[in-house]
Amino acid sequence: MQEIFLCSISNVRSGDCKEDCAYCTQSSHHQGAIKRYKFKDEKVVLQEARALKQLGALGFCLVTSGRELDDEKCEYIAKLAKAINKEELGLHLIACCGRADLEQLEFLRDAGIHSYNHNLETSQNFFPKICSTHTWEERFITCENALRAGLGLCSGGIFGLNESWEDRIEMLRALASLSPHTTPINFFIKNPVLPIDAETLSADEALECVLLAKEFLPNARLMVAGGREVVFKDNDKQEAKLFEYGINAVVLGDYLTTKGKAPKKDIEKLLSYGLTMATSCH
């Protein structure tokens, strides 16, 4: 039976990002109707971690909004990592905090963070069409820094931004050059506050994207993330094909600013597809 890895996200700092990423409701340029707060209370994050472990998940990603890591964010994430690891839950801790240099990433590694998530999002050629406040090259360098720091790299992208198939191939080729241990696959969902006017991908096209990702990243853990609920709706037959086509990890529960599936029901559905829950990240 195929094993599936479960991961969950905690949006530990939300909103008021000065970047203008056209796909993100956390950008202050778009005025999305989202919750905004500076830092989530440590006790709340610990409760989330314990609940996640009870569900059988292995990965826990701590996400902060904003362009990059700074001293305050570094100290906050390090404090959370130490507190979670003290609980001995056996969770694989991932930080996702934007652009970061080598010294910052080494600091997080020493504090107990295991991996760093920084998505390329799309191709180098298409990126300027969805963001003008930082470059694709900056993203790529941060990914390289994570590897140099001895962290696991989690890096992927978004499909359905009006990019071409050539853009998809270019992004996947760039990701392959980084050899990430995990590649999140997101599907863009249209939102009236966002400037991207793109229709939601069909389930068939989304599955083609997964097949393409598997071709370029045969050894990466392919993790279906944002957009799964909308693209596949209640079409169990099509959703089950995700795992036949190469997906072997799932984001459980809510995303940064959008609702996901109810975790317990989602796990029941995954088990009905003949999948088993992985018990180790290795």
Curated annotation (Swiss-Prot):
Q: How does the annotation summarize its subunit structure?
A: Homodimer.
State the PANTHER family in the record.
BIOTIN SYNTHASE, BIOTIN SYNTHASE, MITOCHONDRIAL
Tell me where in this chain the Radical SAM core domain is found: 1-228
Binding residues for [2Fe-2S] cluster, per the UniProt record? Answer: 61, 96, 154, 221
**Name of this chain's protein:** Biotin synthase
According to its UniProt record, which reaction does this protein catalyse?
A: (4R,5S)-dethiobiotin + (sulfur carrier)-SH + 2 reduced [2Fe-2S]-[ferredoxin] + 2 S-adenosyl-L-methionine = (sulfur carrier)-H + biotin + 2 5'-deoxyadenosine + 2 L-methionine + 2 oxidized [2Fe-2S]-[ferredoxin]
Name a GO molecular-function annotation.
biotin synthase activity
- Cite the entry's keywords alphabetically: 2Fe-2S, 4Fe-4S, Biotin biosynthesis, Iron, Iron-sulfur, Metal-binding, S-adenosyl-L-methionine, Transferase
Q: Which InterPro entries match?
A: Aldolase_TIM, BATS_dom, Biotin_synth/BioAB, Biotin_synthase, Elp3/MiaA/NifB-like_rSAM, rSAM
Give a GO biological-process term.
biotin biosynthetic process
Entry's HAMAP family? BioB (MF_01694)
Pathway membership: Cofactor biosynthesis; biotin biosynthesis; biotin from 7,8-diaminononanoate: step 2/2
Q: Which gene encodes it?
A: bioB
Cofactor annotation: [4Fe-4S] cluster; [2Fe-2S] cluster
Kind of enzyme, top EC level? Answer: transferase
- What EC numbers are recorded for this enzyme? 2.8.1.6
Where on this chain does [4Fe-4S] cluster bind? 17, 21, 24
Q: Which domain of life is it from?
A: Bacteria
Q: Lineage of the native species?
A: Bacteria, Pseudomonadati, Campylobacterota, Epsilonproteobacteria, Campylobacterales
